[in-house]
């Protein structure tokens, strides 16, 4: 399995260990809440070159031009840094710091060294995936994240994995519609929404969101969208038409 292989080889990753951070930490939570207060959903736009699910970025390969097109519509950016399967590059994060927008490090983080490196390249939020990490491990990793003043996006797909999520004040909870074990979209976003709502934390819906289905999605504070935006789908325009009132979309 691809994701298992990535985790198994994390100790072999070549990480940037020189401090290349050029600004303070920016809060993704605050950025999303500001959008919500203005009756908008927060959009986290993803930059990636390819993914094992079959996506190849042929349209928006220049991350600077990509940002110029989307920056007025987004609450933050998600940048893939995993190299082997996603062609990610840590230097993308270093470069995007100049825009003063919250940056989510999209990788399969499993140790303190990866968190420290993510901080040094300019990341603000660390992704932790509950489907592949035990609760004790998540708690340990988030202690490190908090010690650096960063936030954590803790995502799950399997509803049973939800109980592994720590509900600390620096946490955002994400529901990934994609099963990372099969790479298929298996949507239980309405049930997941109820679980997340019980924590009182901000929620993010992830994967397979397009201009055709975004209006049918349940209420989340934010949506993480990659392939559709990168493929020049009109999903950002559709998202801008949605009124977020704190209880649902209209």
Swiss-Prot record:
Q: Which GO terms describe its molecular function?
A: indole-3-glycerol-phosphate synthase activity; phosphoribosylanthranilate isomerase activity
Q: Which domain of life is it from?
A: Archaea
Keywords in alphabetical order, please: Amino-acid biosynthesis, Aromatic amino acid biosynthesis, Decarboxylase, Lyase, Tryptophan biosynthesis
One GO BP = L-tryptophan biosynthetic process
- Quote the pathway field: Amino-acid biosynthesis; L-tryptophan biosynthesis; L-tryptophan from chorismate: step 4/5
Identify the EC number(s).
4.1.1.48
Q: Which reaction does it catalyse?
A: 1-(2-carboxyphenylamino)-1-deoxy-D-ribulose 5-phosphate + H(+) = (1S,2R)-1-C-(indol-3-yl)glycerol 3-phosphate + CO2 + H2O
Q: What is this protein called?
A: Indole-3-glycerol phosphate synthase
Instruction: Name the species this protein comes from.
Output: Picrophilus torridus (strain ATCC 700027 / DSM 9790 / JCM 10055 / NBRC 100828 / KAW 2/3)
């Amino acid at each position: 399995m691809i994701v298992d292989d990535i985790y198994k080889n994390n100790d072999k990753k070549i990480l940037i260990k020189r401090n290349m951070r050029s600004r303070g930490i920016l809060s993704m939570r605050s950025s999303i809440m500001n959008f919500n207060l203005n009756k908008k959903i927060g959009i986290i736009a993803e930059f990636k070159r390819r993914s094992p699910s079959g996506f190849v970025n042929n349209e928006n390969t220049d991350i600077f031009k990509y940002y110029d097109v989307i920056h007025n519509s987004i609450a933050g950016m998600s940048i893939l840094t995993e190299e082997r399967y996603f062609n990610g590059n840590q230097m993308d994060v270093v470069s995007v710091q100049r825009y003063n927008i919250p940056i989510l490090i999209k990788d399969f983080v499993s140790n303190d060294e990866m968190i420290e490196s993510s901080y040094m390249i300019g990341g603000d939020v660390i992704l932790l995936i509950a489907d592949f990490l035990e609760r004790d491990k998540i708690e340990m990793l988030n202690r490190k994240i908090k010690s650096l003043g960063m936030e954590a996006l803790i995502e799950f797909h399997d509803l049973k994995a939800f109980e592994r999520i720590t509900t600390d004040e620096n946490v955002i909870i994400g529901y990934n519609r994609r099963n990372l074990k099969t790479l298929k979209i298996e949507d239980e976003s309405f049930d997941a929404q109820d679980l997340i709502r019980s924590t009182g934390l901000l929620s993010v819906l992830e994967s397979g969101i397009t201009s055709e289905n975004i209006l049918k999605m349940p209420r989340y504070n934010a949506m993480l969208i990659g392939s559709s935006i990168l493929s020049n789908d009109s999903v950002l325009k559709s998202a801008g038409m949605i009124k977020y009132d704190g209880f649902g979309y209209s």
